[in-house]
Each structure stands twice: as C-alpha cells, then as structure tokens.
A protein has these predicted regions:
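Conserved beta-strand elements of the Class I
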Residues: 17, 23-26, 134, 146
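Zn-dependent metallo-beta-lactamase
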Residues: 1-22
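Histidine-centered active-site/metal-ligand motif
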Residues: 13, 30, 108, 137, ...
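Flexible, charged surface loops at secondary-structure boundaries
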Residues: 17-19, 61-64, 97, 141-143
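Conserved beta-sheet core of the metallophosphoesterase superfamily
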Residues: 124-159
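Active-site/binding-pocket entry motifs
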Residues: 31-32, 141
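Core catalytic region of metal-dependent phosphoesterases/phosphodiesterases
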Residues: 24-26, 33-129
Length: 159
C-alpha cells in the first residue's frame, strides 16, 4: 500500500510494516485479556498469549524489522502482571533482543501499567512521530501526518 510517506506492507496477522523505517506496527495485542475474562467467569480458551506472541514472531521473521511499535494496549489489565504471562513475555523478548520496541500508551495501558523495565520496551505518549507517520492508539487528526492507530476493534454482532 503506497502512502505519501512511503509504502506500508500489510500482513495476514494484522500488522503493518514500513520498509523505509524498517518498522513493524501492531495495535491492541491485549496480552492477558483471556485470563482476565476467565477470572470473571467468561469461558474463553487458554493459550492465547503464546499464540499472539508466536504470530508476532512470524511477522518479525517475515519483515525483519529493526523496531517494533505497539500502537497501544499491549497489556489488557493489571492482571497481566502475573508470573506466567510475564514469563512468556520475557522469553519472547529474549528471542528478539536485537529489536528496539516502543509502546505508544493506549487506554488499557494506563490501567494495566507500563510493561516491566526488564522487557526493555520504551513507553511514549501519543502521537509519536516517525517520519511522516503519527503513531497513536486513539484515531485522531495530526497535521501533515498519516496517522497509524489502533483502538477501534472490529465488531461482529450475533443475533
């Protein structure tokens, strides 16, 4: 996909890659969401954290970025700061130590808290400028920039 600020390559795992910046963009990972729902009695499957991390690793292998930008909501809730999830996240991060990683804070990040410093993920506020791209969590207008944002989740209504 061509933009005024360079190409973006879209992946089947709902990420985007900027070849010019060697940057991978991913939004709304929501690690720990399934465990949070299960704790509230909602029957959702286990194992989604590892599946999501594996998909991210596939995207990293496919595009070979120098940096990964999380466009908000990396962690779903404070419950994500548990030994099991953080252990998986630390093991995943150890596989990708060569990559710079930045989290643009989203609405869930303010509730969940920043990722532990041991993950070596920088945390910034929106909009974060990368060339002509304004990296955000909440869709918004940024003058003279192309906004890359998350927050708006696809919705399916079942009758």
């Amino acid at each position: 996909m061509e933009t005024p600020f360079g190409a973006l390559q879209l992946s089947r795992h709902k990420t985007a890659f900027s070849p010019a910046h060697k940057a991978l963009f991913v939004a709304d990972v929501h690690l720990g969401k399934a465990a949070t729902f299960r704790s509230l009695g909602v029957p959702v499957p286990a194992g989604t954290t590892q599946e999501n991390l594996d998909k991210l690793s596939e995207c990293i292998a496919e595009f070979n970025p120098l940096s990964v930008y999380f466009l908000g909501d990396l962690l779903h809730a404070k419950m994500a700061h548990n030994p099991d999830l953080l252990g998986k996240l630390l093991a995943w991060r150890a596989q990708h130590t060569n990559l710079a990683m930045t989290l643009i804070r989203g609405n869930h990040d303010s509730k969940a808290g920043d990722p532990p410093a041991s993950l070596n993920i920088s945390v910034v506020e929106e909009p974060f400028m990368l060339g002509g791209f304004a990296l955000c969590h909440h869709p918004q207008t940024v003058q003279n920039a192309l906004v890359l944002a998350g927050h708006e989740h696809p919705v399916v209504v079942l009758n």
